Amino acid sequence: MITFIYFFGNIIYYLPIYSYINNYKFMLMVIIMDDLTQLPGVGPTTAEKLKEAGYTDFMKIATASIGELTEIDGISEKAAARIIEAARELCNLGFKSGTEVLSQRKNIWKLSTGSKNLDEILGGGLESQSVTEFAGMFGSGKTQIAHQACVNLQCPERIVADDAIKDEILNEPKAVYIDTEGTFRPERIVQMAEALGLDGNEVLNNIFVARAYNSDMQMLYAENVENLIREGHNIKLVIVDSLTSTFRTEYIGRGKLAERQQKLGRHMATLNKLADIYNCVVIVTNQVAARPDALFGPSEQAIGGHIVGHAATFRIFLRKAKGDKRVAKLYDSPHLPDAEAMFRITEKGIHD
């Protein structure tokens, strides 16, 4: 397939248009530009300030808060409220019927983990427009699952989607890997890719890797994913490995707990917006802490408290079993029951 990408100003939406010339299928990615001066009180100067701050389209403005817009020089609270309200009207944000929501969920696609058992408890695989958390002790398989997801994104057989949107997803999909612990290994990506008959270097070329040494860098990289999308990259997978390690080392003690949780909440909100607006899969890995007072139930719990608990769509706890076997327990989901699955981690990657 030959792909043409046309750029018209700022990148907002990717509308695939298909045509056939001499039996070749062409996908024209038409990009529609939002004119910010359509918003009340926004002239060319204010529009430029909004773009410089990253608010390049109506949807991003519609999902912003008044406080965020007032950080831009020259925008008052009253003006920010007016701008946001107008953007929401243009984006048709508001109440929808249950049937409309059900129809919209047809755009959701799923990415296989590599294990049929694990896919089954997830309802078919890693779901787009969602944040999936994998928590567990060291060596439980969190980073391996993240690496495998990057490889599987380049394997059409491991993507489950309606025909109407599958071509969009398969149009040179790319992954973003935010590495906070220095555990990303390109050699492992190559090894997993070759096990599936893929070109390891080609898979690596479709992964954007960023090493975050503190929470500010981590949050900035997540926010900058939109810049990659605006540059024309078809980002369909975002990974943060791991979510809470930088926050734990920077905010020590109960005195800084509230500040840490607020910041972590903002980070999770960014990841949720990416998943929802751009229809991508978001994976976060998470560390655990011991529960010395636990008489019943698990002796470890995921870091992040209620902030992460409420923000993550699917929560899975991983633990070691015998040899190369691992056990995954789905313990939180909006629509799936609690369930366990066993999978293996070998040289070939994740499988049953």
Swiss-Prot record:
InterPro entries, sorted: AAA+_ATPase, DNA_recomb/repair_Rad51_C, DNA_recomb/repair_RadA, DNA_recomb/repair_RecA-like, DNA_repair_Rad51/TF_NusA_a-hlx, Hlx-hairpin-Hlx_DNA-bd_motif, P-loop_NTPase, RecA_ATP-bd
CDD domains associated with the record: archRadA
PROSITE patterns in UniProt: RECA_2 (PS50162), RECA_3 (PS50163)
Annotated ATP binding sites: G136, M137, F138, G139, S140, G141, K142, T143
Keyword tags: ATP-binding, DNA damage, DNA recombination, DNA-binding, Nucleotide-binding
GO terms for biological process, alphabetical: DNA recombination; DNA repair
One GO MF term attached to the UniProt entry: ATP binding
Domain of life: Archaea
Cited Gene3D superfamilies: 5' to 3' exonuclease, C-terminal subdomain, P-loop containing nucleotide triphosphate hydrolases
Function according to Swiss-Prot or TrEMBL: Involved in DNA repair and in homologous recombination. Binds and assemble on single-stranded DNA to form a nucleoprotein filament. Hydrolyzes ATP in a ssDNA-dependent manner and promotes DNA strand exchange between homologous DNA molecules.
HAMAP family, sorted: RadA_arch (MF_00348)
Family as reported in the entry's similarity comment: Belongs to the eukaryotic RecA-like protein family.
Protein name listed in UniProt: DNA repair and recombination protein RadA
